Amino acid sequence: MTTVNLAAYRFVSLDSIEQWRPLVAARCNTLGLRGTILLAPEGINLFIAGPREATDAFVDYIRHDPLFEGKFADLPFKESLSDSQPFRRMLVRLKREIITMKKPAIKPELGRAPAVDARTLKAWLDQGHDDAGRPVVMLDTRNAFEVDVGTFDRALDYRIDKFSEFPAVIEANRADLEGKTIVSFCTGGIRCEKAAIHMKDVGIENVYQLEGGILKYFEEVGGAHYHGDCFVFDYRTALNPQLAPTADVTCFACRAVVPADAQQSPLYVPGKCCPACHPGDSGTPGRRAEPGAEPARAV
């Protein structure tokens, strides 16, 4: 495997993103990187990929260049490897939010919700409760089509089609969360962090976010208490608990996830259609990925 894939995000107040955008894009292009970087007043969200020397140089740049005034000096990155470049081009975009919730009162850059690390969460799930004896509820904050690729055992899944639906479904299902320890989770941490802050703000108690999301959990403890793989918003489509790309692909036409067995169907035509959207099939078309949900569009 020769390509290094980096993912990172941070909620932090940023005032100079218009000035940063062309400079960051130029540095990434000089290094030969591809991917997506989102900049918003509330922070940064990125997925980039390239050779080791290029990704190392980018990490040094974002952490230490005076341009960023130390805001990313300790920015943590999640790393995985792939045989090829998963992105087609390099994009640096300005957004209102780095992950869209459409709740302007939420200010995650002003303080985080409590977080639980992977090893502590595994211990809670092993014993069936947290350290205070409360039952632990895993709350999936991702879109329904992502959940279908894999999720934690017995996780709550409200079948949302986009993250901006999250506040409404939580309000409608508060009874599911009362008296329990809630651990929100997502792919890399960004959605579950914002989700946990929202739940705290509306008065739900004992809420945690999974530090680093599913990918960090895989890195630290593997696939314990998790079934399936983890959808990612790039051309790898899904990663297994060893953080290796799976045989799943994304349908060119409808963006549905097509697992290996479905690729054997005569209704699957690479570059044209899959069993979910084949014109001769009466099935339901696959759900599309929400633009901006993760930094390949983006984390």
UniProtKB/Swiss-Prot annotation:
EC numbers, comma separated: 1.14.-.-
UniProt xrefs under CDD domains: RHOD_YceA (cd01518)
Family annotation (InterPro entries): Rhodanese-like_dom, Rhodanese-like_dom_sf, TrhO, TRHO_N
Occurrences of domain Rhodanese (ranges): 132-226
Residue positions of the active site: C186 (cysteine persulfide intermediate)
Stored PANTHER family: RHODANESE-LIKE DOMAIN-CONTAINING PROTEIN 7-RELATED (PTHR43268:SF3), THIOSULFATE SULFURTRANSFERASE/RHODANESE-LIKE DOMAIN-CONTAINING PROTEIN 2 (PTHR43268)
Family designation: Belongs to the TrhO family.
NCBIfam families per UniProt: PRK05320.1
Name of the protein in question: tRNA uridine(34) hydroxylase
Taxonomic path: Bacteria, Pseudomonadati, Pseudomonadota, Betaproteobacteria, Burkholderiales
